[in-house]
Design a protein with these regions (language model features):
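Basic, helix-initiating cap at the start of DNA-binding domains
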Residues: 1-52, 59-60, 65-66
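Hydrophobic/aromatic-rich alpha-helical bundle segments in the mid-to-C-terminal region
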Residues: 133, 155-205
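Amphipathic alpha-helical packing segments from all-alpha helical-bundle domains
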Residues: 96, 107-108, 116, 120, ...
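Short coil/turn segments at alpha/beta junctions that flank glycine-rich nucleotide-binding fingerprints
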Residues: 35-39, 128, 157-158
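Hydrophobic alpha-helical connector segments
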Residues: 70, 83-116, 161, 165-172
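Short, basic, alpha-helical segments at the C-terminal edge of helix-turn-helix-like DNA-binding modules
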Residues: 73-79
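Short loop-to-helix capping motifs
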Residues: 63, 111, 127-129
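Helix-loop "lid/cap" segments that line or gate small-molecule binding pockets
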Residues: 103-110, 118-126, 207-210
Length: 213
């Protein structure tokens, strides 16, 4: 008796196997989500912009919301990649380490990837809690955790006196999220490099004054 043919395997969801096609699709989706937001963005227009079929989008991401989550995840990865591990810095030179960490974080908060990701996530706050939670876990929480780990090592080396490393890390990073960052989110004129350097030096001075051993 002839056996019936085996059913075709179901397509696996995730990024398309072709890296170039994946890049085009995520970049096109990012542009459309930036311009129109999640609710008004159109999958047909995204697919046409990326040069793929609408079927490809749904086969790989399941829905427009799934594609949006992939875009946010891609941006989060790029953002975190811009901040090298703080743990690798010398705990015996906290001022130098904080200047390096602060400079990278300041550049990150002014960058298009981070600002675009924040705008996109703010636009779905409440409606897409899983997307927001994952963005926070992969982005802000991870950066804060790495800085806290460095502060623990500096505390152990007795070059800083930090009783609550997570709180101290939060306070340090928050000093870079003032009016300059808000202007960036609102697409207004950004602070120039001289203002940013002055902010960096003052943030490190204030932190060392509070936590220096």
């Amino acid at each position: 008796m002839t056996r019936p043919p085996a059913p075709a395997p179901k397509p696996q969801r995730g990024r398309p196997r072709d890296p170039e096609r994946s890049r085009r699709l995520l970049e096109a989706a990012q542009r459309h989500f930036n311009e129109h937001g999640l609710e008004r963005a159109n999958v047909d227009a995204i697919a046409a912009d990326a040069g793929v079929s609408k079927t490809t989008v749904y086969n790989n991401f399941g829905s427009k919301e799934g594609l949006f989550q992939a875009v946010v995840g891609d941006r989060s990865a790029k953002v975190v990649a811009g901040v090298t591990s703080a743990v690798a810095l010398d705990p015996n030179q906290p001022e130098k380490a904080l200047l390096a960490i602060g400079a990278r974080f300041l550049a990150l908060t002014r960058g298009d990837d981070a600002l675009g990701a924040l705008r996109s996530v703010y636009g779905v706050a409440g409606a897409q809690p899983d997307v927001c939670r994952e963005f926070y876990r992969q982005g802000p929480e991870r950066v804060k955790g790495e800085l806290a780990a460095y502060l623990r090592s500096a505390h152990s080396a007795r070059t800083l006196k930090v009783r609550n490393p997570l709180q101290a890390a939060d306070l340090f990073l928050s000093m870079f999220l003032g009016s300059g960052h808000i202007r960036g989110l609102l697409k207004l004129e950004m602070a120039d490099s001289r203002e940013d350097r002055a902010l960096l030096r003052e943030a490190v001075r204030v932190f060392m004054e509070a936590y220096g051993a």
